[in-house]
Structures are given as C-alpha cells and as structure tokens.
C-alpha cells in the first residue's frame, strides 16, 4: 500500500506478508532520508487492510456487529480492532431513481495502554462511515472518514457517469 500526495502528511509505503508475518514500512525520517521499519508480527486471519469496502459489501444483510483487524503504521506497525455495525438504511438517488443503501459505522478500537489513554487525551480515531447498495451485486456508494491515521476527514461518493449522445453511433 502506498500513501503519497498532498492528503498524506507523512508519505509511506507498506508491504504486508501475512504468511511470513512480516511488515515493512518505508517512510521519511523527517530529514528527507528514507527510513525502513521491519517488524515480525503474528498477523490475524481477519486482517482487513485494503479490503474494508469489499468486507462491507459481503456482510450478510441484518448483521448486528462484525469484528475485524487492521494494521496501522505510525510508522511503527500495530494492530487495531474494527467494530463494524449497520446503522440502518439511507435513501439516495441514481438517475432520478430512489435506492436504499445500508449505512455502516466502523469504529477503530485501539488496544492496550493506547486504548486507555487515547480517550482521555482526545486522540480517539474518528469513526468511518460507509454506505453500501445491497442486492445481487452490492456496490460502494459513499464513505466518510480519514484516509490515514491523524488525517483529515474525506468524503468519497459514487459519481454517476453521463455519456454523450452520438447521432452517428450504431
């Protein structure tokens, strides 16, 4: 996974090898030099890095709460928990047709001492909100949350394409 560009205060590239239990983080040391951090960790089978929206699309309708894990890098790798719960349905429109999307809230659960101290210091990660269109082929509709630890809240929405009419198309 690569985090680079104006949205990321601390650019980094992360490689995760679950079977070997190896996490490698390439980051900047603050002086322009590359810093490589390698950790050997026991990684859980429910690791959701890079697959959160795929996971949400595959949750059965009516799920009460689902737990998963995520690896965060600051740049030191550490595991956090994800508590995923459906918050009902919201109505939206595509081409003037009303549809319902399941609204999910993903809470990041910090572990250990960090999890105890973060709320006292106002450093709890914000919730991630995601909307998934249910059906035979579930689809991502919208998300709102940070793209990286400590980053700003971003809203990403599905944009319906509009194709030009071509008189000579056959």
Residue spans for each PLM region:
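Acidic, serine/threonine-rich low-complexity disordered tracts
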Residues: 1-20, 63-170
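Short, surface-exposed secondary-structure junctions/capping segments
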Residues: 26-30, 53-60, 100
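N-terminal secretory signal peptides
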Residues: 25, 39, 43-44, 50, ...
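Short acidic/polar alpha-helix capping motifs at helix-coil junctions
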Residues: 49-57, 91-95
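An acidic-aromatic
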Residues: 1-46
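Low-complexity, compositionally biased segments
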Residues: 20, 31-32, 49-52, 61, ...
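A general, composition-driven signal for non-globular sequence regions
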Residues: 36, 51-54, 61, 103, ...
